[in-house]
Amino acid sequence: MTAFTVNGTQVTVRQSHPHLLSALREELNITSPKDGCSPSGQCGCCTVLIDGKAVVSCQTSLEKTAGKSVVTLEGFSEREREAFASAFAACGGLQCGFCIPGIVVRAKAQIDKKGVDLKREDMARHLGAHLCRCTGYAKILEAIECVAKNDVPSIPPVAGVGTRTPKYEAKELALGDRGYIDDMRVPGMLHAALHLTAHTRATIRSIRTDAARHADGVRAVYTASDIPGELMVGIIYKDWPVMIPIGGRTSYAGDVLAIVVADTRQQARSAAALIEVDYDVHTPITDVDVALATNEIAVWQTDGNVLSTSAYQRGDVDAALGASSHVISETFHTQRIEHAFLEPEATLAIPSVDSSRRVKVYSGGQGIWDDRNDIARVLGIDNSQVTVELVTNGGAFGGKEDMSNQAHTALAAWLIDAPVKCVLSREESFLMHAKRHPIRMHYEMGCDDHGMLTALRVRAVGDSGAYASVGMKVLERMAGHASGPYHVPAIDVEAIAVRTNNPVGGAFRGFGANQAQFAMEGMLDRLASRVGISGWEIRHRNVIQPGMVWGPGQTMDEGCAGAAACLDAIKPHYDAARAEGLPLGLGLGLKNSGLGNGFKEITRAVVRLEDDGSIEVRHGWTEMGQGINTIALQVLIEELGSHISIDPAKVRVIVDTTRELGLGQTTGSRGTLMGAGAVQAACAAALSAGLARGVDHVGEYRVDWTTKLGDPGVTNPIIHSTFGYAAQLVIMNRETGKVDRVVAAHDVGRAMNPTLCEGQIEGSIHMGLGYALTEDFPSDPTSGFPTNMTLRSLGILRAKDVPKMEVILVERPQPRAPYGIKGVGEIGLVPTAGAVAAALHELDGTWRNRLPMRRAGSDEE
């Protein structure tokens, strides 16, 4: 046993814990320190104070803790807790919130040491021990500065659309009081761990589980033979095995072979490592060109290595290129990227205690209705026997669209008839969930003597890894966005998604538009250089305008005026930097909101008023930091606040499958668009019913008028109903060769909440700069296994590395959209890499065509 004090109380804990974090969370039930990467100590989420010094508790042994004083956020004084909570709420210093408690602890250590003399740049340096994937750090540093200077601003009131309403549950998130799935405890709860494959392409000959079954604390071990229903799941294609059976073949590094259920997480993980597997190993297919050329099938139970082909043509490209004054050809390469959300995937499943044979699953996924349907499929039961409730997650960015461990956890709970929780380790998370696609894009583009574009031909091949996920849609989106926000009279595009034994390629913020825009912006800058005009000028001359035909043939509506408006908003900053002789680059981008491409998007919401003044708002969208619950609250107040008195403290926002409200994933920057529309309609229903109490007032919003990409029978193919636009200016420091400043003008249609909009954009810029300059998630070409298996190795920018950011909100309303909304979550990193590439070219004269980029001759190259 080990004795020490926690928050002023003497405690004694078991010595068997691998580190202090485990003792705090698993034995003492102190959950403000979060487990984002234990035991590597690279995310900072588990930071606590030991004798007044900030340390990461997942790298602190109990031996080093003995006799010392440990303080967590729970032990802060009420004055300190209120100051930090209010500052982060008022400044918008959090989104998903998972990283914030650890950051607050480190901030306290620095404020205790330096007080009002704490400088922003010093705090940024101390945050080098922490990662935040959501915010871009700017508003975090602002909040800390307010606390340090004893100048905490008042929290804005909760109000309607267009106001700086504080984030829903902001104070609870800042203090670590609003729990995530791993913070949940229920009586009789067991823990599950997974055994993953050791080979990316191998036939399973046998799975020996005896040693695991007899290990301490183990209650059960399950393999594919224990699945009572279907083996395969998937969002679009049912091609992803929940587990690989004996006689089956693995297809990527994240394939699951067995589930171990034990009394503790440590016991489950230790026992899972005891499972022995006999493999017949095959050579992995890890190169897209090999996959296209070979007759061998990379992925088990599929009939070929081409997942999809997306193509369209408009005009005579050959003739237009032949008549062009300038024609440029270039091949661009983008890399695979890991989402690195701070909360690893977690699921809690609880079977019913009566004879009804039901199971309730707590999920952090981006599509709980899809989760429900596939869980029922695996268990071989009706959808009505499964309830999935969303627990607001600690970040996702597309990486939690596919199920990770939801089906495994539900299966274990169902079979053992007890509550089961499964939390992935950071390494398991890296191996299992889908990544951003690496894509090779060959562009050939022409223009006339004035820089007016004439034609574009694109041939793209994307490595979609093993299973379908939404890979075909990512390449479809890349194809649709291939020409960017520009008018190109003739166009010919083909994009192929290829199956390999590499990590699965799926949804990631930008969803194919990032890759396309990196190439398109690079082509524009090369043509501008040929013609002898500026980067701003060539974009201004070619930007899409209302009434023009865009890319796949869609005649653009008034909403596209935002593209030119963003260019106009950035122009003074562009001219000023140019006058100073600073190396700069400009990027312009567009990104759809919604799925489009002929998909019928329908969503519903419920508003329920009670006699005690409480209100329930139920919608179908996953809160993952972007603020959809806040928007739902604002719409409620906007629509009903003048009719009834609404106490925000008595409004509860709920997302679960007890009502049929959802359709698909929270993806494509459509959460605010669709969610606001549905809540607005539900409020209208409540008004029509005389604001009746105790009943569900249901509203529906639908976008069912879009057209499939490449449909030749449609005169005006409306591929997407809504687009967001952004212009970003990247300014370099000539001496250091680093990005000094980013100015971002974003057309958001209507700034539903300016603070949330700014935060989304700042976080996107941070992610976009990493994508452009430092981030990578390569895999070994001989094995298919990823090689960067720690958070630090991913190349994510830390707080001290993030340049100054200035956000300009442009509002050009979108016709037919509620409140004129356009999506903002993804567009923020669509133009970034192209802008950085142009700035680097101005710095050293080298054109870039491969991500991530480095300054020529730098020691980072």
Which residues make up each language-model segment?
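Intrinsic disorder at enzyme termini
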Residues: M1, H126-I181, P552, A564, ...
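Signature of N-terminal electron-transfer/Fe-S-associated modules in redox systems
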Residues: M1-V158, N597
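Glycine-rich loop/linker segments at domain edges
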Residues: G92, T163, E169-L175, G304-T347, ...
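Flexible, low-hydrophobicity surface segments
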Residues: A148-G304, V327, L415
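Short beta-strand elements
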Residues: E172, R178, A346-P351, R440-D449, ...
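C-terminal catalytic domains of large/alpha subunits in multi-subunit enzymes
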Residues: A224-S225, G380-Q385, L415-V420, D449, ...
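Phosphate/diphosphate-binding loops
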Residues: V256, A262-T264, A418-G465, G677-H697
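Helix-loop-helix junctions that connect adjacent transmembrane helices in secondary transporters/permeases
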Residues: A293-L379, V543-S614, Q634, H697-I718, ...
